Swiss-Prot record:
Catalyzes the hydration of cyclohexa-1,5-diene-1-carboxyl-CoA. This is Cyclohexa-1,5-dienecarbonyl-CoA hydratase. The gene is dch. It comes from the Bacteria. One of its GO terms (molecular function) is cyclohexa-1,5-dienecarbonyl-CoA hydratase activity.
C-alpha cells in the first residue's frame, strides 16, 4: 500500500525517539480493516527500536474517529473484524513504551476503544467521547475491558449502558482524559519533550513493564471472555443483527427483546 493511499501516516521524529501515527481518512477516520492493519503493521515495525521512547497517535481533520465500520460488524465479517481490532488493542496494551493519544472532535465507538488502549490521553475541552454501540443493539467489547480500570466501574457502566457522549471536560473529571488542552497534539509533544525525551529508553521500558505487569494481563484475560460473549451469544441474538441492519438501512430498529 502506497503512503498516499494508506489510511495511516507513519513517521519518526525527535531523532527516532518518537513514533508518530496519524489516522488519515478524514473526516470520519473510520477504524476499519485497512486502518487496523496499518496500525498493527506500524507498531510491529517500530516498537522494538532501541531508541524509541513513546508513540503519539492523533488524526487528520476535525475528528479523531467516528468509530468502527458498521458494515464489518455484520455476521459475515464480524469475527474477523473483532479479532483484528482486539489484536491491535492487545498490541497497544503490550507496548514497551508509553502511547500518547491526542484527541479532537468526535471520538466514538471503536475510535474510543483504540484511544483508551493508549496510556496518556490529551484532549480538547470540546471533544466528544462515547460508546454508542448499545443504541445499535450491540455492546463495546474492548471498551468493556478498558474503561473500568481507567474511569472506575460506575462511570464505565454509565457510558457503556447509556451510549451517551461526554465532552472533554467531563472526560477529564472522571479520569478518561489525562490532560485538557486547546491543542492536544502540542500538549502531548510538550509532555514528551519535558518528561520523556531525555530519559534512558531502556530504563523507561522497564518502568512501563513494572507499572503494567498486573493490570494488562487482567484486561487481556477479560477481553478473551468478552470477545467470546460477543461472537457466540450476542451475534446469535435477533436484536443485535436487527440493530445493525436498521442502522445501515437508516431506519428505526424493531426490537423483539431476544
Amino acid at each position: 500500500m502506497s503512503e498516499a493511499s494508506s489510511p495511516l501516516k507513519v513517521w519518526l521524529e525527535r531523532d527516532g525517539s518518537l513514533l508518530r501515527l496519524r489516522l488519515a481518512r478524514p473526516k470520519a477516520n473510520i477504524v476499519d480493516a485497512a486502518m487496523i492493519a496499518a496500525m498493527r503493521q506500524a507498531l510491529g515495525e517500530h516498537l522494538q527500536a532501541p531508541a524509541l521512547r513513546a508513540v503519539l497517535l492523533d488524526a487528520e481533520g476535525p475528528h479523531f474517529s467516528f468509530g468502527a465500520s458498521v458494515d464489518e460488524h455484520m455476521p459475515d465479517q464480524c469475527a474477523q473484524m473483532l479479532k483484528s481490532l482486539h489484536g491491535l488493542v492487545r498490541e497497544m496494551l503490550d507496548s514497551p513504551v508509553p502511547i500518547l493519544v491526542a484527541l479532537r472532535g468526535q471520538c466514538l465507538g471503536g475510535g474510543l476503544e483504540v484511544a483508551a488502549a493508549g496510556n496518556l490521553l490529551f484532549a480538547a475541552p470540546d471533544a466528544k467521547f462515547g460508546q454508542p454501540e448499545i443504541r445499535l443493539g450491540v455492546f463495546a467489547p474492548a471498551a468493556s475491558c478498558l474503561l473500568p480500570p481507567r474511569v472506575g466501574q460506575a462511570c464505565a457502566e454509565d457510558l457503556l449502558w447509556s451510549g451517551r457522549s461526554i465532552d472533554g471536560a467531563e472526560g477529564h473529571r472522571i479520569g478518561l482524559i489525562d490532560v485538557l488542552a486547546e491543542d492536544p497534539e502540542a500538549a502531548a509533544l510538550r509532555w514528551f519533550d519535558e518528561h520523556i525525551a531525555r530519559l534512558s529508553a531502556s530504563s523507561l521500558r522497564f518502568a512501563v513493564r513494572a507499572a503494567r505487569c498486573d493490570s494488562v494481563p487482567r484486561i487481556k484475560q477479560k477481553l478473551d471472555t468478552v470477545e467470546a460473549l460477543y461472537l457466540e451469544e450476542l451475534m446469535a441474538s435477533h436484536d443485535a443483527v436487527e440493530g445493525l441492519k436498521a442502522f445501515l438501512e437508516k431506519r428505526s430498529a424493531n426490537w423483539e427483546n431476544r
